A protein has these predicted regions:
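Active-site-adjacent structural elements in enzyme catalytic cores
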Residues: 1-207
């Protein structure tokens, strides 16, 4: 899918149409870029193992190559498939805050840190599961611009540059996820977002 026009499919955020989800998953598998709703902001999904798709994702967003991409998952087994293992503190956070607006950084077998997030949004979870490939998804906007909370906002910034947008209405939270590194002890918050540091500190030690 490489047209100059971005397709839009409306989906019920609670009961998304299976055909729309399948269409989005197919676009991702084929190397396309798909805007989709999460509970925080709209994400821009790409096949993590497709080099051309990742190159295009960085180019479309005008994103610095030094900024890593978060892996979005629909179940915990996807963490191990990505070459990582949950730490003890990570398990505690996942149990209490996933699905939800929390990105957890883990260290891979090769020593590289990878962020994981399980969004609390039915459209997102079904799209990730149906893709059957590892999915990365930064916010669906030009870098430095306000993250979009609606399909219209995605199209305003990236219309004609991406392949598909699944329009699931306005996002519920509207604030980006909190990012925490649990590969170190005590854990370190890299970005405070929808979940406040003081809330996380009730569950694990934070620097």
């Amino acid at each position: 899918m490489r047209s100059s026009k971005t397709a839009v499919l409306k989906v019920d955020p609670r009961r998304p149409d299976a055909a729309a989800i399948a269409c989005g998953a197919r676009v991702i598998r084929e190397g396309g870029l798909v805007g989709f709703p999460t509970e925080t902001v709209y994400g821009l999904a790409a096949h993590r193992s497709d080099r051309k798709a990742i190159d295009r994702l960085y180019a479309v967003k005008k994103r610095s190559r030094g900024k890593p991409l978060t892996v979005h998952i629909s179940d915990m087994t996807m963490i191990r498939s990505a070459g990582c293992r949950m730490t003890g503190s990570g398990k505690i956070l996942a149990k209490n805050f996933w699905p939800g607006p929390l990105t957890i950084l883990l260290k891979s077998a090769g020593g590289r840190k990878i962020g994981f997030r399980m969004p609390a949004n039915t459209v997102a979870l079904r799209l990730i599961a149906a893709s059957k490939v590892p999915v990365v998804a930064p916010s669906a906007n030009l870098s430095g611009k306000r993250p979009p909370t609606s399909a219209a906002a995605v199209l305003k910034g990236l219309g004609g540059k991406i392949d598909l947008v699944l329009d699931g209405g306005r996002t519920a939270v509207g604030i980006e996820s909190t990012v925490i590194d649990v590969s170190v002890s005590p854990a370190v918050i890299l970005r405070e977002g929808a979940i406040k540091a003081r809330v996380l500190a009730k569950f694990i030690d934070i620097a």
